Swiss-Prot record:
The lineage of its organism: Eukaryota, Fungi, Dikarya, Ascomycota, Saccharomycotina. This is Chromatin structure-remodeling complex subunit SFH1. It is found in: Nucleus. GO terms for biological process: chromatin remodeling; regulation of transcription by RNA polymerase II. Residues 138-147, 155-166 have a biased composition (Basic and acidic residues). It holds the Pfam family SNF5. Residues 124-137 have a biased composition (Acidic residues). Residues 124-183, 383-407 are annotated as: Disordered.
Length: 441
């Protein structure tokens, strides 16, 4: 089999029995010696065979009149896989997002490793100890200098590389091999399933929170909404794609999918609210992203006629100038809070009438608060230290446990139908023996 190299559309072609065929070792030829991203990426070559019409030898005049080279290249590129390489995982690891947090502890140098507690030696003070310490320090310095020289001879190349980053943070040197993310193959669905899924349906959105952690290595945390009637994407596929995108070991996909399935199983759809009736509740939000805390208190209509949690979160992020990571976090928190309030309202465990301090007894309007001027109804954005955040989390857990106890106590009280209690059929005349000693009688 003889090969005659030809250059049509900047692609190497071989002639076999006067038919154009791509060999498995196909490599595009460019003057700059760089692979075209649409033809080859990550050393993965498109190995499909493409047959073209017969043409004459490259030296014949018919080759010069051949004008189908652009169509030939277009036909090849249309069947090639796209986006085989991505720098998303590397950008996430730069620390500008809370989706992937690097929890590797910072190690101190050998000179500052030993921490001395001087409070233990306050009573045992002796001047001779300082002389012994000086001798020990001198011997330690000599031994350290000798060891540093030995290490410098062995790792001279590494030190030269580290010295290049004078005044900057040198990259960490790791001897661990890097594992590439496993390839994810697309799932093919029959045409009947796609036609069924194309019908417009009202989604039942469930707030999902996924958090996996490898101690002293990384922590992944994400918020999103999941359709209860989802049939295309399974939790296992979603977890596999997430691990591949973040370059996380594939073993954590089982933990992610288990968390999603658990939250989907715990979700129970609340009964529908009365139609044409506005159900107003007081919502208190507290969302923490990195070191920034967003708190807000507002009134919400559970009927959802005026706004959705997504629209509210988008408006808050734009008005307050928050980061884009607050959008899914606020949406998740608001969905979860509204679901709890809706169940509590149907169970009559919260007051039906909301005191929103509106003027003239209206359902909505300006709030009349002469003492605090509506301070509690204003959104707050604060940047806290880790100690303050830990203290706030403890207070939040304590308040949530208190609310659970109160709701359990309210659930034990039997429900009383007020309409039947005050109806005429239930009224009766009390005799004198049943009257109490109240002055009203």
């Amino acid at each position: 089999m003889g090969e005659k190299p030809n250059r049509i559309g900047r692609a190497n072609i071989s002639y076999i029995n006067h038919d154009h065929i791509f060999l498995p070792s196909f490599q595009p030829s460019y003057p700059s010696r760089q692979l075209h991203p649409l033809i080859s990426s990550q050393n993965k070559v498109h190995s499909s065979i493409v047959h073209l019409p017969k043409v004459a030898s490259p030296s014949s005049p018919e080759t010069q009149q051949h004008s189908q080279a652009p169509l030939f290249i277009t036909h090849i590129m249309s069947g090639l896989p796209q986006a085989l390489a991505s720098g998303f995982a590397a950008r996430v690891r730069e620390g500008g997002t809370t989706l992937y947090i690097n929890t590797t502890p910072m190690l101190r140098s050998a000179r500052h490793n030993t921490a001395v507690n001087y409070a233990e030696f306050e009573e045992d003070f002796d001047a001779n100890d300082f002389e012994d310490d000086d001798d020990d320090d001198q011997s330690q310095r000599e031994s350290r200098d000798g060891s540093e020289e030995a290490e410098g001879d062995e790792d001279g190349t590494k030190k030269e590389e580290q010295d290049k980053f004078a005044g900057l943070k040198a990259p960490l040197v790791s001897n661990e091999p890097k594992r590439a993310a496993p390839p994810v193959r697309p799932v093919m669905y029959p045409q009947e399933v796609l036609e069924e899924l194309s019908q417009v349906k009202e989604p039942t959105l469930i707030p999902i929170r996924v958090a996996v952690e490898n101690i002293d290595v990384f922590r992944v945390q994400d918020f999103f909404l999941w359709d209860a009637d989802e049939k295309i994407l399974t939790p296992e596929q979603f977890a596999t794609l997430t691990c591949a995108d973040l370059d996380v070991p594939i073993g954590y996909s089982a933990q992610m999918s288990a968390q999603i399935k658990k939250q989907l199983a715990e979700y129970t759809a609340a009964p529908a609210l009365p139609k044409d009736v506005e159900v107003h509740v007081i919502v208190e939000l507290a969302v923490t992203v990195d070191k920034i805390v967003y708190e807000d208190k507002f009134e919400w209509d559970l009927s959802g006629e005026y706004a959705t949690p997504q629209e509210f979160a988008r408006t808050v992020v734009q008005d307050l100038g928050l980061g884009q990571e607050f959008y899914p976090a606020i949406t998740y928190q608001l969905y979860e809070t509204l679901g709890k309030l809706q169940k509590a309202w149907l169970e009559r465990s919260i007051p039906l009438d909301v005191d929103n301090r509106a003027a003239f007894g209206l359902e909505a309007g300006l709030r009349v608060d002469q003492d605090n001027l509506g301070e509690s109804w204003v959104p707050r954005v604060e940047e806290m230290t880790p100690e303050e955040m830990q203290k706030r989390e403890m207070e939040r857990d304590r308040s949530s446990r208190r609310l659970k106890r109160e709701s359990a106590r309210m659930a034990e009280v039997p429900y009383v139908d007020l309409d039947s209690l005050y109806s005429r059929k239930r009224r009766r005349r009390f005799d004198e023996d049943s009257r109490s000693g109240s002055p009203m009688w």
